[in-house]
UniProtKB/Swiss-Prot annotation:
Its main location: cytoplasm. Transmembrane segments: none annotated. It holds the Pfam family DCB. GO terms for biological process: protein transport; regulation of ARF protein signal transduction. The active site is at E634. Residues 494-529, 1229-1248 are annotated as: Disordered. Inhibited by brefeldin A. This is Brefeldin A-inhibited guanine nucleotide-exchange protein 1. Residues 514-523 have a biased composition (Basic and acidic residues). Keywords: Cytoplasm, Guanine-nucleotide releasing factor, Membrane, Protein transport, Transport. The lineage of its organism: Eukaryota, Viridiplantae, Streptophyta, Embryophyta, Tracheophyta. Activates the ARF proteins by exchanging bound GDP for free GTP. Plays a role in vesicular protein sorting. It is a peripheral membrane protein. It comes from Arabidopsis thaliana (Mouse-ear cress). It comes from the Eukaryota.
Length: 1687
């Protein structure tokens, strides 16, 4: 025999087998194992002679088939010996052959004669000898065999191999061997199903983790370092196989690309067949139960447990094949789910834990294909335990809580549960029940209830349930962040570090699990939209509401469902609802079907008719009929239902009974029998004979067959007739209406069995069948489709369901528990909840969480503060930093907390309080003291301190303000101790919140500022302890955020400015000053930034100064504002742009201030601005210059000193000089100039172009219009000065104005000046091309001018018009109309001024006027006269109601008492108006007369015509006025009563006729051509005759008068005194008439003599008061009449 070094020869197999055979020879008993020894020697000799000869069909590498059989025979013989020393080398040899892949081929039960089959069978068999070492060796060989890629162990052989390992585990006495057996089985599962997944023998394999296998079971068999030993055992086997050389051929080829992977034939399909078979048998093993006789079979329980553990390994490591391959998916549904279902009734905790672990994996990985199953198992495994609050199993419930926490690690899983179940009409509200169940657990058993839990267990449950709720809300937040596609997770960073990473794909790969695969066979993309899900959920909620109502009041419920269109209004549709809807109360269904109303009756008939009883015996039919509802208790209702049932049964089975009455009676009997047989209260049961006897003669008088009745009796007695959902087990008291509503009563009843012992008895088979039917029924519905959503809007519905329970759980736990870990967990939950609700924009929910957290800080009651309250403060700060962009209105609560923290910290440090801002009466010494350091010296009985120590409610703006009494020392000590807790929060953390504001988004910073303003206002208004903390923070955040884009900053500042205004107007002067000074600092910084043209940011920024200046009642504040504005402007003048508007508004308000020092201070700055910085004003928009002018004008209104007013006007002149001297020309550089028509010939081009720019026009407009308004000032000096400055400006600089601009100047500047005396604005509408804005087109008439002012204005106007007549000639008609308006003014001064100005205008320009221009002048004068006449006549009509002297007695004539006050006022007004009217008319006559006299050579006939019309009209009016005797009497009486002088009516008449006569005579004499053209001579004669008649009227009595006095016609009576006076007054006029007649040419006199001769004769008869009349009359007779007679 060769040496041991060469044993086995040269072949590879020989080198492995040889040493083993040699060892067998040495260990064998020579006598007992002679044949074995000889066989070994023979093989050794043979191996020496063999060489490697590859044979593909050979099971042994390098040998032929025959050689392989011979070589392996000794091994088989050794294994059969049962002798351990021989078996060990044989097993070792087998292990090497398998590990080195020297054995190859397919092993299956179909070829039991194959060498490999025999070898494996022999190996399995040796386990029976009971040697522990042999067991380990067998396990090693079997694992190596399965591990070998060259051997495919199939079918029963594979099962036998697994069973062998299974038996080692179950029957072993060594803990290490048991662990190894389990580990080997788990490794085999990994190998088999990894290859099935890959469909190849060459798949990469993972090594099982032994420690994970012991997580649930077998912890008790873990002896010493057994786990380490077993892990090494598995690793050795796996690595030994990896050391094998590369195979020379592949046993199983993977399917070619494009080929089907589900072929029925081929090696690839065999791998999957084996995997499926193994999975199926494991499921069967897990469903083995003890017999009723032997319920304590612990071996069976362990085997079941092991099977479930192996199934867990398979499921945990399963891949996409389980969803993509229908066969594997169905295996899970039909086998694994059935196993879970059957084992669900067991109370063995390890089994329950394994079920939960398997279910968790199914949820994670396969939920998309198992929607219906998940909907059943979740309530069965999880919810029923979770909702059991009073009598839970501690381990069981902890398992469920662990499961829930585990599934929350996958955010998609939580979302999918809600979408596919809570939003599914036919599915239970799993998510809602999870949250509510966790809430119940977190709150613990209700008060007063009994529970089996120990206090420690109860606390554990509470904390774990809170952790689960935190995990849920965290998962929701994680999913939300993922869907929003945010680069960095939106989850708070500090929270991300507290929990494992959310990258589940990576973490799950490490622990051997993966998330649900992308393959979703039932995925419905159309339903993934959140809006659709919202509709479905709303429909479900509404329908559940109807079901709940039905279970209370069936008829109301049906009406509601029909009205809400959840159920159709036909009986058939209602029947479908009753039969197919889960959650309906069976008793209520029966009650409804038995109702006597019409519609329920129709429903009952339709319900019964929906059943098909064909070929059913009566017992089956009634049992089938009653499975859907419970018969009502009322006999009449049962009668109606049974009557219809009998009819339906007979209709389906017409040959069963002779009539329906038989079926009706028999049905009643069966119901009574069922009650009698199965009611425990009935002691004496009905016998079969009794039943038969009771039913005799019911078939139309005949008896039914006894056999028939007997069989029916047996059916009912043996098998109770009951509803399909009824269970033989009683319902738990914990069962609630929600379970019924979701149709889970029947499912949950089976798991409510309470077993005190671990009995391996399975669930009720009937119930299992019912559940399987539910699976099948749901799988065919559209609702079974699995939905995946990506729209984060779905979170809104989830939050609506969960936020209440979460808030309650977190709040109650945080409030009741002082455990630090519990508090931290609750605060994490709050933070996640705030994150989700804030990002989703759910304001109510967000504010609820934030408010609760703020309350839990306990800052409002610091005396009771604990560590958990400080943690809440930290959480509040973290929320502010991390979710600040989404807090919106919730910022108020957070900032309130920060304010209170700072307050408490200041109190603790003894720093001075803010009282110094508010208590102005305190001495400086007291202000400096502040509060003592509380931590060192205790506290004083200070009101503020006592209020803080006492505390208050969270919502109160102040803390304990109205609680009287001193605080006790122990209260103070406790308060100081609690203040030490706040040392954990540094000022940096507080300030960081405010500094972080610059990182907030636009909407967030706006909300932040709003909230801070609100908090600050609350601080300032505190009645006990006002503070400025938030006010200072407002200034800080303004600094922080000032560099934001202008659009955002303007929104921020609009809020801040309103706040600063409200605080600046505060009654507290110190606070107002503080705010204004802070505002000044902000403004100074803001003005450092340059502003581009046409922006308004600076103006908006400075607006608070303006408003406070305008509204503040404090002189100190107003003075401070003026100083602030002055400092800002003078130091930042180059950067001020739009801010000028606010600057001038402030100074404008200051100019009208009641304090002289404020006025002078503001004017001093204005003076400096105008003198030194005028160019900065004009470089901005035109409105800025307008504001400057308005400001200066306001200063002119100052009543403190005339120097300010006059200086302001001088500055207006200065502004004009600056404008005219080119103060704006530099702005036009670079502007392309266009040629324009020069105003005059001597202007430079730059000056010509200067006024063509709209910008430059806009600068002059406010200046000129401002001065124009000043002309109506009540002070004469201001009026005169403004008039002078205005017209000087126009006269000095008018040459640079364009023609268009001049039109605007007249319409908007000059004409409004005269409104106060003219009262008409008609001129302003005549110039449509005005460049002036409409705001300057009207001028307020505030004061009436005196004569001097009127004269000045008119003089200035004429001078200006004369100077620029060439340019403004078009305004002549308006100017003349204006002067005519002055003339007709009621006041004498303007009238005289108008006359003088008009005459001067005509004198200066008369020779330059055209015909039309002259005509315009006279027409204007004519219009003035006519307007005056018409208005005066209206005035005279007011005297009509005053009685004349004819109606009064002599005593009453002058009796003032008989005239009322109104009449006296009317008389006084008429007298005054008459006097002014006469004056105006005389002035008009004078103007016309003077114009003709001076310019008669320039006037044409058309002009003369207008002149004559004017004089004729006025003279006629004067005559009419003087001839109204009644009016004269009334006026005379009024003057007598009022002691006034009478109006000069006679003088008015005489003067007008005198002028009229003079003009006519002058025309006839000096302008015969015009006289002839206009027949002036005829008009002259007419006037002369009229004058003579007027004279004769007062000197002679006319005929009508004689008749009245009844005197003879020829009587001559002497004149009275009045007539003499009138005659004397008219004498000069008569003389003038006689002279005019005398001067007529002879022909003319002769022509008119017949007309006036009688009048001359009458003059002779008249009594004259003047001798001059007779003398001139005699001359007329002598000269004219005599000459005419001589002819």
């Amino acid at each position: 025999m060769s040496s041991s070094q060469n044993l086995g020869g040269a072949t590879r197999c020989g080198r492995v087998i040889g040493p083993s055979l040699d060892k067998i020879i040495k260990n064998a008993a020579w006598r007992k194992h002679t044949f074995l020894v000889s066989a070994c020697k023979s093989v050794l000799d043979k191996l020496e002679a063999l060489s490697d000869s590859p044979d593909p069909s050979s099971p042994l590498f390098g040998l032929t088939t025959s050689d392989a059989d011979a070589v392996l025979q000794p091994l088989l013989l050794s294994l059969d010996t049962g002798y351990a020393k021989v078996i060990e080398p044989a097993l070792d040899c087998s292990f090497k052959l398998f590990s080195l892949s020297l054995l190859r081929g397919e092993v299956c039960s179909s070829s039991p004669d194959s060498l490999l089959y025999k070898l494996i069978h022999a190996i399995c068999k040796v386990c029976g000898i009971g040697e522990e070492s042999i067991e380990l060796a067998v396990l090693r060989v079997l694992l190596a065999a399965v591990r070998s890629p060259r051997i495919l162990i199939r079918g029963d052989c594979l099962l036998h191999l697994v069973r062998t390992c299974y038996n080692v585990y179950l029957g072993g006495f060594n803990g290490t061997n048991q662990i190894c057996a389990k580990s080997v089985l788990a490794q085999i599962m990994l190998i088999v199903f990894t290859r099935s997944e890959a469909n190849s023998m060459d798949a990469s394999l993972k090594t099982v983790n032994v420690n994970d296998l012991l997580a649930i079971t077998d912890k008790n068999v873990n002896e010493g370092n057994s786990v380490h030993i077993c892990q090494g055992f598995i690793n050795d086997v796996i690595t030994a196989g990896e050391a094998a050389p590369p195979p020379d051929f592949a046993l199983v080829q993977p399917p070619e690309e494009g080929a089907s992977s589900t072929e029925d034939e081929g090696t690839g399909s065999k791998i999957r067949e084996d995997g499926f078979l193994l999975f199926k048998n494991l499921c069967k093993l897990s469903m083995k139960f003890s017999s009723q006789e032997n319920t304590d079979d612990q071996i069976l329980v362990r085997g079941k447990t092991l099977s479930l553990e192996l199934l867990k390994v398979i499921i945990d490591n399963g891949g996409p094949i389980w969803l993509s391959d229908e066969r594997f998916l169905n295996a899970i549904k039909q086998l694994l789910c059935l196993s879970l279902l059957k084992n669900s009734a067991l109370s063995v905790m390890s089994i329950f834990q394994l079920q939960c672990a398997i279910f968790t994996t199914l949820l994670r990985k396969y939920r998309s294909g198992m929607k219906s199953e998940v909907g059943i198992f979740f309530p069965m495994l999880v919810l029923r335990v979770l909702e059991n609050v009073l009598q839970p199993s501690f381990v069981q419930k902890m398992t469920v809580l662990s499961l829930l926490e585990n599934i929350c690690h996958d955010p998609n899983l939580i979302i999918d549960i809600f979408v596919n179940f809570d939003c599914d009409v036919e599915s239970p509200n799993i998510f809602e029940r999870i949250v509510n169940g966790l809430l119940k657990t977190a709150l613990g058993p209700p008060p007063g209830s009994s529970t089996i839990l120990s206090p420690v267990q109860d606390i554990t449950f509470r904390h774990e349930s809170v952790k689960c709720l935190v995990s849920i809300i965290k998962a929701m937040g994680t999913w939300m962040d993922q869907q929003l596609s945010v680069g960095d997770s939106l989850l708070p960073k500090s929270l991300e570090n507290e929990a494992p990473a959310n990258n589940h794909s990576n973490s799950n790969e490490e622990d051997g699990t993966t998330i649900d695969h992308d393959f979703h066979p039932d995925l419905n993309p159309e339903s993934s939209d959140a809006a659709t899900l919202e509709q479905r959920r709303a429909y479900k909620i509404e329908r559940q509401k109807g079901v709940t109502l039905f279970n209370r009041k069936p008829s109301k419920g049906i009406e509601f469902l029909i009205s809400s269109k959840k159920v159709g209004n036909s009986p058939d549709e209602v029947v479908s609802f009753l039969r197919n809807t889960t959650g309906l109360n069976a008793t209520m269904i029966g009650d409804y079907l038995g109702e006597r109303e019409d519609f329920p009756m129709k429903v009952m008939h339709a319900y019964v008719d929906s059943f098909d009883f064909k070929e059913m015996n009566f017992g089956e039919a009634i049992r089938f009929f009653l499975r859907g509802f419970r018969l009502p208790g009322e006999a009449q209702k049962i009668d109606r239902i049974m009557e219809k049932f009998a009819e339906r049964f007979c209709k389906c089975n017409p040959n069963s009974f002779s009539s329906a009455d038989t079926a009706y009676v028999l049905a009643y009997s069966v119901i009574m029998l069922n009650t009698d047989a199965h009611n425990i209260m009935v002691k004496e049961k009905m016998t079969k004979a009794d039943f038969i006897r009771n039913n005799r003669g019911i078939d139309d008088g005949k008896d039914l067959p006894e056999e028939y009745l007997g069989a029916l009796y047996d059916q009912v007695v043996i098998n109770e007739i009951k509803m399909s959902s009824d269970s033989s087990a009683p319902e738990s008291r914990q069962s609630n209406g929600l379970n019924k509503l979701l149709g889970l009563d029947g499912i949950l009843n089976l798991v409510y069995w309470t077993q005190t012992e671990e009995k391996a008895v399975g669930a009720n088979g009937l119930l299992i069948k019912d559940i399987q039917e539910k699976f099948r029924s749901k799988s065919g519905k559209s609702e079974s489709a699995y939905h995946v959503v990506t729209d984060v809007a779905i979170l809104r519905f989830m939050v609506e369901v969960s936020w209440g329970p979460m808030l309650a759980a977190f709040s109650v736990t945080l409030d009741q528990s002082d455990d630090r870990l519990a508090a931290v967990e609750c605060l994490r939950g709050f933070r996640y909840a705030v994150h989700v609700t804030a990002v989703m924009g759910m304001q109510t929910q967000r504010d609820a969480f934030v408010t609760s957290m703020a309350k839990f800080t306990n800052l409002h009651c610091a005396g009771d503060m604990k560590q958990k309250n400080v943690d809440a403060v930290k959480a509040i700060i973290s929320i502010a930093i991390e979710d600040g962009n989404h807090l919106q209105d919730a910022w108020e609560h957070i900032l309130t907390c920060l304010s209170r923290i700072e307050h408490l910290q200041l109190l603790g440090e003894g720093a001075p309080s803010d009282a110094s801002y508010f208590a102005s009466t305190e001495t400086e010494e007291k202000k400096a003291l502040g509060f003592p350091n509380l931590k060192k010296k205790g506290a004083l009985q200070n009101p503020v301190m006592m209020a803080v120590v006492r505390g208050g409610s969270y919502d109160s703006s102040t803390i304990g303000p109205n609680m009287p009494g001193l605080v006790k020392q122990d209260q103070i000590n406790n308060f100081i101790a609690n203040l030490n807790l706040l040392d954990q929060i540094g000022s940096f953390q507080l300030n960081n919140v405010y500094a972080h504001s610059q990182r907030l988004k636009t909407e967030a910073i706006v909300a932040f500022v709003k909230a801070l303003c609100k908090v600050s206002m609350s601080e300032l208004q505190s009645p006990t302890d006002p503070r400025v903390f938030s006010l200072t923070k407002l200034v800080e955040i303004a600094h922080y955020n000032m560099n934001r884009i202008r659009l955002v900053w303007s929104r921020i500042w609009s809020i801040l400015s309103d706040f600063f205004v409200s605080v600046g107007l505060s009654e507290n002067l110190s606070v107002a000053i503080f705010v204004m000074d802070s505002l000044r600092q902000l403004s100074m910084k803001f003005l450092e930034r340059e502003e581009l043209a046409n922006y308004n940011f600076q103006n908006e920024f400075l607006r608070p100064f303006v408003i406070v200046m305008q509204k503040s009642s404090s002189a100190e504040i107003r003075e401070l504002i003026v100083r602030c504005i002055s400092q800002m402007v003078l130091s930042r003048v180059s950067n001020v742009k739009s801010g000028w508007k606010s600057v001038f508004k402030v100074f404008t308000t200051a100019a009208a201030d009641e304090r002289k020092n404020i006025v002078l201070l503001a004017f001093e700055t204005m003076e400096k601005i105008v003198r030194e910085y005028f160019s900065y004003i004009t470089e901005t928009e035109a409105t800025t210059f307008t504001d400057c002018v308005r400001c200066l004008i306001t200063f002119t209104n100052s009543t403190f000193t005339s120097d300010v007013s006059l200086n302001a006007i001088a500055f207006l002149r200065f502004c004009a000089l600056k404008l005219a001297d080119g103060g704006l020309v530099w702005n036009e550089k670079g502007r392309s100039s266009s040629p324009s028509t020069p105003v005059t010939d001597d202007h430079s081009p730059s000056t010509q172009n200067f006024m063509d720019a709209d910008e430059n026009i806009s600068y002059w407009v406010p200046l000129l219009t401002g001065l124009s308004k000043l002309t109506s000032d009540s002070r004469s000096a201001i009026r005169k000065s403004s008039l002078e400055v205005l017209f000087n400006i126009l006269k000095d600089h008018g040459h640079i104005f364009s023609r268009t601009f001049w039109i605007g100047v007249f319409s908007s500047v000059i004409y409004p000046i005269f409104n106060s005396v003219w009262g008409e604005n008609d001129l302003l509408s005549k110039d449509e091309h005005s460049s002036f804005p409409s705001t300057f087109s009207s001028h307020p008439s505030e004061v009436s001018w005196d004569a001097e002012t009127s004269a000045m204005a008119a003089q200035y106007l004429v001078d200006l018009f004369v100077s620029f007549f060439t340019v403004i000639r078009s305004q002549l008609s308006s100017v003349v109309s204006l002067l005519a308006g002055l003339i007709r003014s009621p006041a004498q001064g303007p009238t005289v001024a108008g006359v003088g100005a008009l005459l001067r205008l005509a004198d200066e320009l008369g020779d330059r006027f055209s015909e039309n221009e002259w005509k315009e002048i006279f027409l204007a004068v004519n219009e003035a006269a006519s307007l005056t006449l018409s208005s005066f006549m209206k005035t005279l009509r007011t005297m009509d109601d005053i009685p004349d002297e004819d109606t009064l007695s002599d005593q009453d004539f002058s009796n003032e008492d008989d005239i009322d006050e109104d009449s006296l006022q009317t008389m006084s007004y008429v007298v005054a108006r008459t006097k002014s009217h006469i004056t105006v008319q005389l002035q008009v006559v004078q103007v016309v007369t003077d114009l003709y006299r001076i310019h008669q050579q320039s006037l044409l006939a058309s002009h003369v015509t207008v002149i004559l019309e004017i004089l004729s009209s006025i003279s006629s009016h004067a005559h009419q006025l003087n001839s109204d005797l009644i009016l004269q009497k009334k006026v005379r009486r009024a003057c007598s009563i009022l002691e006034l002088s009478e109006p000069p009516m006679l003088h008015f008449e005489n003067d007008t006729f005198q002028n009229y006569l003079d003009i006519l005579q002058a025309i006839v004499t000096n302008n015969p051509g015009v006289s002839l053209e206009l027949n002036v001579e005829s008009q002259l004669m007419t006037v002369c005759m009229q004058i003579l008649k007027m004279y004769l009227k007062c000197t002679l009595f006319q005929g009508d008068e004689l008749e009245e006095t009844r005197q003879p016609k020829n009587w001559i009576l002497p004149m009275g005194a009045a007539s003499k006076e009138e005659a004397a007054a008219r004498s000069p006029l008569v003389v003038a008439v006689l002279k005019a007649l005398r001067e007529l040419k002879r022909d003319s006199f002769k022509r008119y003599a017949p007309n006036f001769f009688p009048l001359l004769v009458e003059l002779v008869r008249s009594e004259h008061s003047s001798s001059q009349v007779p003398q001139v009359l005699s001359t007329v007779f002598h000269t004219c009449m005599g000459a005419m007679m001589d002819e």
